[in-house]
Design a protein with these regions (language model features):
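Bacterial N-terminal signal peptides
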Residues: 9-17
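Bacterial N-terminal signal peptides that target proteins for export
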Residues: 1-9, 189-190
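Bacterial Sec-dependent signal peptides at the C-terminal "C-region" and cleavage site
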Residues: 19-23, 207
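A short, hydrophobic C-terminal helix/tail in secreted or cell-surface proteins
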Residues: 188-206
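Metal-centered catalytic cores of metalloenzymes
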Residues: 22-90, 94-185
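Residue-level signal for beta-strand positions within conserved beta-sheet cores that form or flank
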Residues: 19, 88, 190
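Generic detector of N-terminal low-structure segments
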Residues: 10, 115, 206-207
Length: 210
């Protein structure tokens, strides 16, 4: 007769059942949307047809934003290439009236993310925003969301989860934005790893002879 040792069974169940509770980081990526403006998400990335109004320029990009709800930080990374104009600003807008479409005001740092490469047609950017600092926000966004950075963070992250926030890259050719991508949550790898470990434990000890 085979049995799973009680202590190991408890550990395995804990790993499977509580994995999501340990996830304090959420990774969002930019996704392209349909050019018709109906709000249909497409592949990861940023482009001109995703803009509102749309454009036919061939520039592309891809960005990620890693949110930590304990540290209250947003780690940003983006790469872009093939722009028609040179970059003039970049930031995240929120919240659009509906998911994956329409426009909204700037929520993050204005006039542009600190350190974002300006005057170029291709490049990369990486920086981490401290969401507890007023300098990470557009002052108008903070004022419209309770007057505190905490209120701004709560509503901004809700917009990210709701697909109502988009990363925009503005250029000399298209002042309103040459390429953009809506923020979309990616699967949680940390939770998946813990669940996998838990299931592996069950498999190993259920096959192990006494």
């Amino acid at each position: 007769m085979r049995s799973i040792p009680r202590a190991f069974a408890i550990v395995c169940v804990a790993l499977i059942c509580t994995a999501p509770a340990y996830s304090t980081q959420y990774l969002f990526e930019t996704v392209k949307v349909d050019a018709g403006g109906v709000g249909i998400p497409g592949l990861p990335g940023m482009d001109g047809p995703s803009e509102s109004p749309t454009n036919t320029f061939t520039g592309t990009g891809y960005g990620t934003a890693l949110y930590d709800d304990i540290a209250h930080t947003l780690a940003l990374n983006v790469s872009f290439a093939g722009l028609d104009g040179t970059t003039t600003a970049s930031h995240i807008h929120a919240a659009t009236p509906n998911p994956f479409r329409q426009t909204a005001g700037v929520a993050t740092t204005t006039p542009s993310f600190t350190g974002f490469p300006l005057g170029v047609k291709s490049g990369t950017f990486s920086n981490t925003l401290d969401l507890t600092l007023g300098t990470s926000w557009n002052p108008s966004y903070v004022s419209a969301h309770g007057g505190t950075t905490a209120g701004a963070e709560t509503d901004f992250i809700a917009a990210m989860f709701g697909h109502q926030a988009y990363w925009n890259i503005h250029t000399s050719t298209v002042g309103g934005g040459e390429i953009r991508g809506f923020m979309s949550l990616t699967p949680e790898p940390a939770s998946g790893v813990l669940i996998g470990i838990g299931l592996a434990c069950f498999g190993f000890f259920s096959r192990r002879p006494r």
